[in-house]
From Swiss-Prot:
S-adenosyl-L-methionine binds at residues 81, 83, 100, 116, 140. Its EC number is 2.1.1.166. It comes from Sphingopyxis alaskensis (strain DSM 13593 / LMG 18877 / RB2256) (Sphingomonas alaskensis). GO terms for cellular component: cytoplasm. This is Ribosomal RNA large subunit methyltransferase E.
Amino acid sequence: MSGSGGKGGGRGGLHVRVKTAKRRSVSSTRWLQRQLNDPYVRRAQAEGYRSRAAYKLIELDEKFGLLKKSRAVVDLGIAPGGWSQVVRKANPRARVAGIDLLPCEPIEGVAILEMDFMDDAAPDALIAALGGAPDLVISDMAANTVGHPQTDHLRTIGLAETAADFAVRNLLPGGAFVAKVFAGGADRELLTLLKRHFTTVKHAKPPASRKGSPELYVIAQGFKGRGDAA
């Protein structure tokens, strides 16, 4: 998940073609070939990030100025850890707590909870691990895709709405929220909630998002506080 000179990630070098092995499906061969030829994958390996998604947050930060002023950050869907790596690199003094059902290798300065964010105990556990309220909540969570665009969209919007509810309940005034959504037109309730509680709400698709991917990110800044929303 996860400075950037040249947002395209660089496209130099050889194109790698992968032959389909006897026990490898055509789809897995295509995935492997895409990975081997992805400039962001190569950059992540060269620069020590755990995933190409790191560059999505880097690019969002370049556009919206999210990280350097943040002192306490919650990373929802932290595994494999690329986004928290970006946070720590941009702001080594920031306190960071992340949560994921999947295991995540330790990251210096980051408290990692291996549990379901949808668990009723998760919000309090995150705030305790962080040591107080956050001023930035970031979420790269996405439901496992089933290949049906509208279903995938609705499931991921559901996660984003839960993440937004956590942010509204816990953010410090002036804080910000970033979450992955899929294009599909069912995000009205999410946007209504965010516009009620934040001064600015925008969508962005960072260059690191794969071409043809339906993913977008919603960026809400200037949290009004729980008592000040119109």
